[in-house]
Amino acid sequence: MSEYLFTSESVSEGHPDKVADQISDSILDAILAQDPNARVACETLCSTGLIVMSGEITTQANVDYMQVARAAVKRIGYNSSDIGFDYNTCAVLTAFNKQSPDIARGVNRTKEEEMDQGAGDQGLMFGYACDETPQLMPMPIYYAHRLMERQAELRKDGRLPWLRPDAKSQVSVRYLDGKPQRIETVVISTQHHPDISHTDLSEAIIEEVIKPVLPKKMLSGETRYLINPTGRFVVGGPMGDCGLTGRKIIVDSYGGTAHHGGGAFSGKDPSKVDRSAAYAGRYVAKNLVAAGIASRCEVQMAYAIGVARPVSLMVDTFGTGKIPDDKIVKLIERHFDLRPRGIIHGLDLLRPIYEKTAAYGHFGRDEPEFSWESTDKAAQLREEAGIEPAETEPLSLQA
């Protein structure tokens, strides 16, 4: 038997790196709403009283970048310098250029040629799914995200009025032979009003944030709760740390359970395969697991700039596949168009849907906009692979 602990973390929408991600994706959404074929690469830095946006944008859209950025910060809840940032008074600087013509010539195509649109860059991307949860996500990252969503909910609806936007979570799960057995440690660090005592804060976080989210059957008397372990977290947000787009790529994906190709998602239009191919990889892996072809599945794709078809495609089912991995590759090639334009069309990615992805994970969420979470190909894949419908359901997340 193999026994081990595995840990994943998440951060709140008010974490400075996530503030930057949300600003970048709010700019992307504002542009796509007017110009779906725009080319956008928006990078954001946020620090004390300052937002800086730069990158490459080629578009016919007319967007007030400063106003869009301020609105994103307002939605997060940074409305006073007392809590680390003020959307109304912060300075906002922009320095955008157009996309390089050397890149554009490999991506732009006529209407007749559009399905052969080349990848916007070289790179490797991974998709992953497993049957640990109904959402077919690894358990540690799934719960870490849900804890941060709960923190934001209680902050925004006023039930815990002393909460502030910046927060982090960490969940450690004990596994036996690859199956989650129990949650051993939960860490939450949350920014707070200076007048709340550590004792009151800890009790409220455990009772109001953690216990309503985590299933009772995964907790025990030995589960450790580490709440604000330093004892104080008043200075936070961009005042506490400089935030940058693309610095939370493991939080954004699978919490370290799966490989990562290194490319960030936020601020990039879907011609950038860092984003669109990672979404496609999740779509492929999730459908394979939903079909019962494997209980764990990781897909790797690689692209060359200006070339439409992936230069490589690899599947690893970690010994859980009902058919050989090389046959699964053939299934993928028959049922999924992994050219950039095929991905964009198949997943309907030219919509202004991206700000919502920029906090609480890009995967494993039941949001109608997240087309890559659909399992619409599972039945067909199952039939072609000759697999009987699964007799067991993934582990329940009901508390």
From Swiss-Prot:
GO terms for molecular function: ATP binding; magnesium ion binding; methionine adenosyltransferase activity. It holds the Pfam family S-AdoMet_synt_N. Mg(2+) binds at residue 17. It comes from the Bacteria. Disulfide bonds: none annotated. ATP binds at residues 15, 166-168, 232-233, 241, 247-248, 264, 268. GO terms for biological process: one-carbon metabolic process; S-adenosylmethionine biosynthetic process. Keywords: ATP-binding, Cytoplasm, Magnesium, Metal-binding, Nucleotide-binding, One-carbon metabolism, Potassium, Transferase. Pathway: Amino-acid biosynthesis; S-adenosyl-L-methionine biosynthesis; S-adenosyl-L-methionine from L-methionine: step 1/1. It is found in: Cytoplasm. The keyword RNA-binding does not apply. L-methionine binds at residues 56, 99, 241, 272. CDD domains: S-AdoMet_synt. Its EC number is 2.5.1.6. It catalyses: L-methionine + ATP + H2O = S-adenosyl-L-methionine + phosphate + diphosphate. HAMAP family: S_AdoMet_synth1. Homotetramer; dimer of dimers. This is S-adenosylmethionine synthase. It comes from Nitrosospira multiformis (strain ATCC 25196 / NCIMB 11849 / C 71).
